[in-house]
């Protein structure tokens, strides 16, 4: 199974494509799509959309896994992240790829085994599970890979129970 994990952000959108086969993870590609704060928001969203569309076309994931919104006191931030999630989901759906959403708690639980794990613990497990030399930077990239790993673990468990996604 090939999964594209996305950590949505307007300035930095983290992405990571992971192959999961025979209970082993292989990182295919990972990185960040960045936009400049001085540019019109509509163009920034378009840049992120086109970047994701290109990644999906090139690496052909079967699934897109994206982090769900979490509560933030800054309503402007929540709205902007919601817009980025919207274009991310649209890029996947327009490419015929199924989308799954996971809360930060679900991601931590799946990757570390503890839903209240610290960010550093999650990043370290991403490094270990993907057999990487170092923790991917920026943090958004490690977070995106964690979301992809979360889907693989969740799907694997459901398949064992006979409820494969």
From Swiss-Prot:
Keywords: Cytoplasm, DNA damage, DNA recombination, DNA repair, DNA-binding, Endonuclease, Hydrolase, Magnesium, Metal-binding, Nuclease. Gene3D superfamilies: Ribonuclease H-like superfamily/Ribonuclease H (3.30.420.10). Its EC number is 3.1.21.10. SUPFAM superfamilies: Ribonuclease H-like. It is an enzyme of class 3 (hydrolase). The keyword DNA repair applies. The keyword DNA damage applies. One of its GO terms (molecular function) is crossover junction DNA endonuclease activity. The active site is at residues 7, 67, 140. Binds 2 Mg(2+) ion per subunit. Its cofactor is Mg(2+). Mg(2+) 2 binds at residue 67. It catalyses: Endonucleolytic cleavage at a junction such as a reciprocal single-stranded crossover between two homologous DNA duplexes (Holliday junction). It comes from the Bacteria. GO terms for cellular component: cytoplasm; Holliday junction resolvase complex. Mg(2+) 1 binds at residues 7, 140. The RuvA-RuvB-RuvC complex processes Holliday junction (HJ) DNA during genetic recombination and DNA repair. Endonuclease that resolves HJ intermediates. Cleaves cruciform DNA by making single-stranded nicks across the HJ at symmetrical positions within the homologous arms, yielding a 5'-phosphate and a 3'-hydroxyl group; requires a central core of homology in the junction. The consensus cleavage sequence is 5'-(A/T)TT(C/G)-3'. Cleavage occurs on the 3'-side of the TT dinucleotide at the point of strand exchange. Belongs to the RuvC family. Homodimer which binds Holliday junction (HJ) DNA. The HJ becomes 2-fold symmetrical on binding to RuvC with unstacked arms; it has a different conformation from HJ DNA in complex with RuvA. In the full resolvosome a probable DNA-RuvA(4)-RuvB(12)-RuvC(2) complex forms which resolves the HJ. This is Crossover junction endodeoxyribonuclease RuvC. It comes from Caldanaerobacter subterraneus subsp. tengcongensis (strain DSM 15242 / JCM 11007 / NBRC 100824 / MB4) (Thermoanaerobacter tengcongensis). The gene is ruvC.
């Amino acid at each position: 199974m090939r999964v594209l994990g996305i950590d949505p952000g307007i300035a930095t959108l983290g992405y990571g494509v992971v192959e999961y086969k025979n209970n082993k993870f292989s990182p295919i590609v990972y990185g960040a799509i960045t936009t400049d704060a001085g540019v019109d928001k509509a163009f920034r969203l378009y840049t992120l959309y086109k970047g994701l569309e290109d990644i999906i076309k090139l690496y052909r994931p079967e699934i897109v896994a994206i982090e769900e919104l979490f509560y933030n006191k800054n309503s402007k931030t929540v709205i902007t992240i919601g817009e980025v999630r919207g274009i991310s989901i649209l890029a996947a759906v327009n490419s015929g790829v199924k989308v799954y959403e996971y809360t930060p708690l679900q991601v931590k639980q799946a990757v570390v085994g503890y839903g209240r794990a610290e960010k550093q613990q999650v990043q370290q497990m991403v490094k270990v599970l993907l057999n990487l030399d170092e923790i991917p930077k920026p943090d958004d990239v490690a977070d995106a890979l964690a979301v992809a790993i979360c889907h693989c673990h969740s799907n694997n468990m459901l398949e064992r129970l006979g409820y494969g996604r």
